[in-house]
Each structure stands twice: as structure tokens, then as C-alpha cells.
Amino acid sequence: KEYTLDSSNLVICDGVKPVAIAGVMGGLNSEIRDNTSEVMFECAKFARDNVRKTSRALGLISDASSRYSKGVDEYATVMAIDRALHLIEELGCGKVSSTRVDANTGNSVEPREMKVSTAKVNGVLGIEVPTEEIIRILTNLNFAPVVNGDELTLQIPAYREDMESYPD
């Protein structure tokens, strides 16, 4: 299927033509087939709002667009590609080139912190959850809660760009 794109749609190109709609869907010319002998791995972070708008405008929902729309931890992309390349070599699935390109734009997400009281958490939930349980849940979600009386200080994981205030 063909899609009409506009200047707000981010695409990935091979130097000549588009090969994917960034964060949404790869094109036919990027598929792996039985006769594929070379593969390029890409791990990227795209602006979640742009991916969400493009996906909706084109009516194109994919696993990729769902993930990118929620925000991606840019640091996890490096770990993910390193792990994938390690497994390819370790399992004998292919030979990894020594060429690696890092096109970091420098738009890193600054570490963020949020303070919230357990009373506010319970108010949002509409039920009384013991502080120990709140701490356990937030720890499992990688928020590294620090308790100071009734107040919790949370370290917001970089991949949770959707977290802007305590109800989130």
C-alpha cells in the first residue's frame, strides 16, 4: 500500500529513497526475504508525539508505533543493539561488521524527579493502599522511591516520558 506523506512525517532513507516511516512501519524494500544476505540493524528513538500523529494520520498502527508513542529510553537502545549483535555472533547466525554509527542528536532526556504523598496516591486510586505496597509497586516499575514520612521522592525512568505529574 502507498501512503501520501507530508513534511511533518519523519522517514528513514537509504540515501536515495525512503525505506521506512520512522517509528511506524518499514517499507517493502526493507523486508528480510529468503535470499537476504546482508542486514542493517537500527535502534533509534523518535519523538513520541510525531510518531503518534503520523500513525494516526496514516491509519497505520503497528507494534513499533505503539512502543514509540509511549516513549523509548534512548539508553536502552544502545543496550538492545549491543545485545542483539552479541547474540548474532554468539549463536552463529551471522558475522557482525565492525562498522557502527551513532547519530545521537544530543536531545537527551534529563533525569527527572517527582515528589508525591501516599495520601495523593491513594486519592487518585480511590482506595487505601499501604505505603509498603506502594513502594513495592513503584520499585518494580523502576521509580526508585525514597520515603520521607508521608512523602515519596521518585526517580522517573528516562523511558517514561509520559510522566508529567503524580496522577500519571
Question: What are these model-predicted stretches?
Answer:
Residues K1-D168:
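RNA/tRNA-interacting regions in translation and RNA-turnover enzymes
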